[in-house]
């Protein structure tokens, strides 16, 4: 499963870069980096005419958790060794009519293994129809696998992005999830589902 997830993240990264370049004519800058223990990743950054700043990054690393982390990470108390692979996408557009988009997904293994991640939008201007469409797409995909997923993971995202000092949310939310042993991202045909939901948001 680890290699399957790694390959899926790499293919998704290539597709996201390709589809972003359809509307953004500036090219991405790529930079590889190495992890101090083992592994590394590929940073793909852009500053363009439509995307003010953006990054589509992948990584695959392994190592050992320190004693503090061993107590907080599932399965690490039995064995501190870990491997992780994932993708992180952040797109901040020039136009206030286009929302900022954040998306990340990871697969982590200790003595246990699981998927985690999330996706959210932060618009400058409120477009109710588009906000409803975004959440309906997420709900539709989640409901294919478990009707409890969407309300549970939407609530988690809403709570995380609630600004207590302002008494208001940041953006329109999305979903957060963690500790899924059989993630909806990796069960056919869900990768196609997630791409259909995600790409219009990033454009």
How should these model regions be labeled?
Residues 93-95, 111, 121-127, 178-185:
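A generic structural motif
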Residues 186-203:
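Single conserved hydrophobic/aromatic residue that forms the stacking wall/gate
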Residues 2-74, 184-188:
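Gly/Pro-rich turn-and-neighbor structural signature
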Residues 42-117:
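Internal mixed beta-strand/loop scaffold within catalytic domains of large alpha/beta enzymes
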Residues 27-30, 150-154:
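Flexible, glycine/charged-enriched surface loops at secondary-structure junctions
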């Amino acid at each position: 499963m680890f290699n399957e997830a790694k390959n899926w993240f790499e293919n998704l990264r290539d597709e996201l870069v390709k589809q972003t370049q359809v509307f953004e004519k500036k090219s991405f800058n790529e930079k590889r980096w190495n992890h101090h223990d083992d592994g590394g990743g590929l940073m793909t950054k852009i500053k363009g005419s439509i995307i003010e700043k953006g990054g589509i990054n992948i990584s695959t690393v392994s190592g050992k958790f320190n004693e503090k982390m061993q107590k907080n990470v599932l399965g690490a108390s039995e064995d501190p060794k870990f491997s992780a692979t994932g993708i992180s996408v952040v797109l901040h557009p020039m136009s206030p009519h286009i929302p900022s988009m954040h998306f990340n997904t990871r697969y982590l293994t200790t003595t246990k293994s699981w998927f985690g991640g999330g996706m959210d939008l932060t618009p400058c201007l409120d477009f109710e129809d588009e906000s409803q469409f975004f959440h309906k797409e997420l709900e539709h995909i989640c409901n294919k696998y478990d009707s409890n997923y969407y309300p549970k993971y939407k609530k988690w995202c809403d709570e995380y992005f609630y600004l207590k000092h302002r008494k208001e949310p940041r953006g329109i939310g999305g979903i957060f999830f963690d500790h899924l042993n059989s993630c909806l991202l990796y069960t056919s045909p869900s990768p196609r589902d997630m791409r259909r939901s995600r790409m219009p948001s990033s454009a």
